[in-house]
Amino acid sequence: MTLGYRIIALRAVHSALWLTSALCVLQYAPEVLPCRATGSTLRADEPAPPDPVEAPFYADKSRLLVLLDEQLREQPIRTVEEWAQRRAHILASMQQVMGPLPGPERRCPLDVQVIEEVQADGLRRRKLTFAAEPGDRVPAYLLLPSGEPRRRPAILCLHQTHPLGKGEPAGLGDNPNKQYALELARRGYVTLAVDYPNFGEYRFDPYAHGYASATMKGIWNHIRAIDLLCALDEVDPQRVGAIGHSLGGHNSLFVAVFDERIKAVVSSCGFCSFPRYYEGNLAGWSHNGYMPRIREVYELDPAKMPFDFTELLAALAPRACLAIAPLDDANFAVEGVRECIAAARPVYELYGAGEHLVASYPDGKHDFPPAERERAYAWFDRWLADTAHRQAE
């Protein structure tokens, strides 16, 4: 297998260059499906059938306003339309490592089943499962605020590496710094916390089911979780965000890159550039819980990787993204976060949205302390919340 490995991406051809802005972007033409036990109506949407395409290899992933054409000649990017083609290359390159984004063959009715509902602290907490694909049900906690019935903003809350999985952000653990699904629900958001494969109550072997990585299975499950949120009567589908710490910090970025329904993202201790990750040793990214091709194909070498987090941040533009990167994070070197922010900023500025990309560098370790959580929640308030409604409650 070579760095020119052919991948699956969504259909697009450009008359002058090879990929259009439609490549690898989910398009939604809703199909209404029944939601069992909730009384809600759920929508499932099928992306266009994938076609195989190739993405060129960009050696310098910090120079983002450059596009490689079919002859691998550099072309300057001066417009949003031209950037969309580079963005398509980024999503294609991610799939070289993660495996292809699933298509209609894995989409099925969500068939939401509520296991229990608990009311406490002015909230309703529903334990439920939903069908991510045929034969696979994902456990989750849905937290619903009290107050007048209306459509509210919603946040997908992704957990860190912890045995409790979804239970920790939902408030069932003993670490108050990781209970962001609970705290955001108290703030007036509908929140959904789901288990990543082989955490909490969720057991699933992605490799036995045709996935090239647990990362891509997580992305697919999280896209389906957004399907669920957007279909709820309690949710405004135009105001959806994602948040996570550590494992959840990079998973929130991954799903947001592939699902543009997510309008605002917070990543706490979630990433740095690959060369800065443990001085370029990518072993931590290469086990079966992440992306084995990093070891098997790219030999743990950042210089051989088809993508980097510089590109992921830029691929979110112009949507709102807050990165929280403590100065003493032992997992993700703060210098590598600064490099990613600096590289992505020109893309945000291309959209006239430089203020939509923000980083916080608190004095601390690999944690999500109160001041940074408040910063994160205020970020969502800025981009998603209905202030008038919140003040009236």
Describe every region a protein language model picked out.
Residues 224-286:
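Primarily recognizes the serine-hydrolase "nucleophile elbow" in alpha/beta-hydrolase
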Residues 150-151, 155-231, 258, 278-279, ...:
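Cap/lid segment of the alpha/beta-hydrolase catalytic domain
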Residues 315-321, 354-356:
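Short, proline-enriched alpha-helix->beta-strand connector loops that line the catalytic pocket
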